[in-house]
Amino acid sequence: SPGIYYAIAHDKIGKRLFSSTVIPNRGAWLEYETDSNDVFYVRVDRTRKVPITVLIRALGIGTNAEIVELFGEEPKILASFAKDTSTNYQEGLLELYKKIRPGEPLAVESAESLIMAMFFDPRRYDLAKVGRYKFNKKLHFNKRIVGHKLSQDVVDTTTGEILAEADTLVTKELADTLQNSAVP
């Protein structure tokens, strides 16, 4: 069923290896895993694995500096840079495209349209309400946002009602309201 699933395994020397799978109601599965060298990999729809930084670049965060700014000095991200042969948005996009569609001619336009269709077209990718609920519940969404300010207005997708305005400090009550509403 749609949602996010976690697993922890151990390698030969006892190091913990983490993995998770995001299963949408409709669309491509995303499988994340770490290896014994702390490199963070992703598989899109059960294809060959690529460093997570390739996917991040393909989604528009192109340079190492931008990735570090977003994720901080996370050791698994830094270790992934060593395995990543791409250095910018276009290279990351083409690298991911090669893994998803091996043997097809490489073109930035084709790669962009594939990524947009796979992850940003609601007709082709949908977590569904159950998947979104499970995702938020497992990630403890409502507990983690308490005490933070909202960067933009939060709108209920079913009614169009503004639930909270930008720059609002999130309280426990507001977090619970957002958790229980139809906010994606």
Segments predicted by a language model, with ranges:
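N-terminal non-catalytic structural scaffold regions of very large proteins
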Residues: 1-184
